């Protein structure tokens, strides 16, 4: 008896099928989450806890030294964390849901803005922070000078306050838009 070899491609054409959506991989998502946690967690701690806590030190020059050393130790980790989160974010953006809602499209653009803003404000904070506590200038805290603080350092501290608030706002924006996108992605599956 002659064996009949089925034409698999023809058979597949007649069967109902659903194309599988390519979602971001687990590794990409994990790198994004870890990177964002390191950057944002460290930034929140530094801005809201460490910067004002140096006021307990009696010597204003020691305050400047403590702030400078604390941020110098965190900056490489924060930069790597934000870098990982940014790369992973754009990798995930390359795999949007098949059926994108208008909400998804709008919020995805907003998240792009916030993640780029996080990078810009982090660089601004880094630059102003380096200048504000340069040579361990006497300070009250990272963002407040003393009577002995040079005027140019006080101006840098003022800019650092603004950059720090913007940095936290961008971080919150990234987290909120990320939650909305995850919800929208699950609706489209």
Where on the chain are the PLM-derived regions?
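Short amphipathic, positively biased membrane-proximal segments
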Residues: 1-189
């Amino acid at each position: 008896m002659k064996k009949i070899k089925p034409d698999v491609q023809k058979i597949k054409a007649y069967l109902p099928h659903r194309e599988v959506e390519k979602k971001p991989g687990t590794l990409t998502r994990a790198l994004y989450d870890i990177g964002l946690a390191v950057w944002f967690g460290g930034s929140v701690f530094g801005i809201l806890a460490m910067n004002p806590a140096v006021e307990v030190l009696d010597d204003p020059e020691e305050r400047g030294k403590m702030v400078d050393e604390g941020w110098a130790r965190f900056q490489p980790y924060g930069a790597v964390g934000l870098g990982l989160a940014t790369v992973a974010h754009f990798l995930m953006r390359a795999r949007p849901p098949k059926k994108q809602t208008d909400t998804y499209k709008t919020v995805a653009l907003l998240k792009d803005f916030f993640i780029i803003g996080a990078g810009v404000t982090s660089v601004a904070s880094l630059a102003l922070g380096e200048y504000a506590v340069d040579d361990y200038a006497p300070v009250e805290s990272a963002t407040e000078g003393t009577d002995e603080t040079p005027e140019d350092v006080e101006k840098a501290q003022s800019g650092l306050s603004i950059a720090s608030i913007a940095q936290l706002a961008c971080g919150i924006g990234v987290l909120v838009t990320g939650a909305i996108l995850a919800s929208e992605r699950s609706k489209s599956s």
